[in-house]
Amino acid sequence: MLLKGAPAADHILATIKENIRACSKAPGLAVVLIGNNPASEIYVNMKIKRATDLGMVSKSYRKPSDATLSDILALIHQLNNDENIHGILVQLPLPKHLDAQAILSTITPDKDVDGLHPVNVGKLLLGETDGFIPCTPAGIVELCKYYEIPLHGKHVVILGRSNIVGKPLAALLMQRHADTNASVTLLHSQSEHLTEITRTADILISAIGVPLFVNKEMIAEKTVIMDVGTSRIPAANPKGYILVGDVDFNNVVPVCRAITPVPGGVGPMTVAMLMRNTWESFLRHTS
């Protein structure tokens, strides 16, 4: 089974759009882009377009790659104090000279729609429900719900321990909720017996950014695979490349039970969760 993200995302976004239409005021989303990373440009434009399509007021704030930390923090403080902005997103990755954690920690937690502020991370770890959950982990859980893939009691193996996906995803999946409550194993570049462990997974989620890393030898029959990775590899086409995931798709499809495509799998869900967090932030600020 192919786990396409668009149908699940469209279902969520349609509800948000309907709710916004019923409001006299629109949610405001600020997207901060620093530098000229081509991939980041694409992601930012996609998020802004999606927000606008839903009826949100979406603004982009662009800073040059040599912007100073003080410049960025001043902008964040400005957005924190703007009553018309309900969600603030700083597009990652940042130029190397900037301290990402310092910037993310400056966003007020109740506008941190990416869910990366230490307060929201802490609430996730504690199982509290009034924080914002990082968008990709939340999107994966929603994708499982849409396709009726149970997580409760299942062994979920996560490849990758990033602060954006791996760690918060592990924390989310272990929560004592009907939609989660999984047994989680988190693997990384220093993990031993990798294949031996991945073959025990009911659900394998890869978020390492290594193209075509996961092959059929690493999974058991009827494993569900969620591929978070997106990489470019050279190809003989007009673009000169194709997008692939962490998983060797054609290699594992005959063996696995279900798999997300790249592109078109987890990606649309990440954007949908950003929109949902922005909507929820709007409700909290206007209630």
Curated annotation (Swiss-Prot):
Q: Tell me which PROSITE patterns the record gives.
A: THF_DHG_CYH_1, THF_DHG_CYH_2
In which residues is NADP(+) bound?
G160, R161, S162, S189, T230
Query: Which pathway, per its entry?
Result: One-carbon metabolism; tetrahydrofolate interconversion
* Any one GO biological process: L-histidine biosynthetic process
Carries keyword Heme?
no
UniProt-listed Pfam families: THF_DHG_CYH (PF00763), THF_DHG_CYH_C (PF02882)
Q: Name one GO molecular function term.
A: methenyltetrahydrofolate cyclohydrolase activity
Gene3D superfamilies recorded for this chain? Leucine Dehydrogenase, chain A, domain 1, NAD(P)-binding Rossmann-like Domain
List its EC numbers.
1.5.1.5, 3.5.4.9
Q: Give me the Gene Ontology terms describing cellular component.
A: cytosol
Reaction(s) the record says it catalyses:
(6R)-5,10-methylene-5,6,7,8-tetrahydrofolate + NADP(+) = (6R)-5,10-methenyltetrahydrofolate + NADPH; (6R)-5,10-methenyltetrahydrofolate + H2O = (6R)-10-formyltetrahydrofolate + H(+)
Keyword annotations: Amino-acid biosynthesis, Histidine biosynthesis, Hydrolase, Methionine biosynthesis, Multifunctional enzyme, NADP, One-carbon metabolism, Oxidoreductase, Purine biosynthesis
Q: Which InterPro entries match?
A: Aminoacid_DH-like_N_sf, NAD(P)-bd_dom_sf, THF_DH/CycHdrlase, THF_DH/CycHdrlase_cat_dom, THF_DH/CycHdrlase_CS, THF_DH/CycHdrlase_NAD-bd_dom
In terms of PANTHER family, this protein maps to: C-1-TETRAHYDROFOLATE SYNTHASE, CYTOPLASMIC, C-1-TETRAHYDROFOLATE SYNTHASE, CYTOPLASMIC-RELATED
Its annotated function is as follows: Catalyzes the oxidation of 5,10-methylenetetrahydrofolate to 5,10-methenyltetrahydrofolate and then the hydrolysis of 5,10-methenyltetrahydrofolate to 10-formyltetrahydrofolate.
Record note on quaternary structure: Homodimer.
Q: Which family does it belong to?
A: Belongs to the tetrahydrofolate dehydrogenase/cyclohydrolase family.
Name of this chain's protein: Bifunctional protein FolD
| GN (gene name) | folD
